[in-house]
Amino acid sequence: HNMPEGLAVGVGFGGGDLGNAVALAIGIGIQNAPEGLAVAFSLLTIGYSRKNAFLIAGATGLFEPVMGFIGVSIVTVFLPILPIALGFAAGAMLFVISHEIIPETHRRGHENWATGGFTIGLLIMLSLDILLG
């Protein structure tokens, strides 16, 4: 799901509204830290060395800047498709959440933690939207 996140940030910056683009980039960046730690810890538990777990977790995030560059490039050249591109990026992220992340949290019995994390994340994003305009 790093690809649609990168695409969303790239499209946001390509659209010219710097305030919203920065808020989106900060929001996605904030959630990338615990996500990367989760990947690294998962790799450690199955026997990877700390170095390899760190490198692999970092490598999973490399798709974001690549897709960000693609998003900026497409929207810069074809500005009229900005709403469509933002809709596609948002839809891709919602699909990943609804079809992968939510079922996984409920399958393992962490419904309350997952709901709390979702609520806190939503409040942070709303706060950033209000503060950064």
Feature locations, PLM:
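Intrinsically disordered, metal-sensing/regulatory segments
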Residues: 3-133
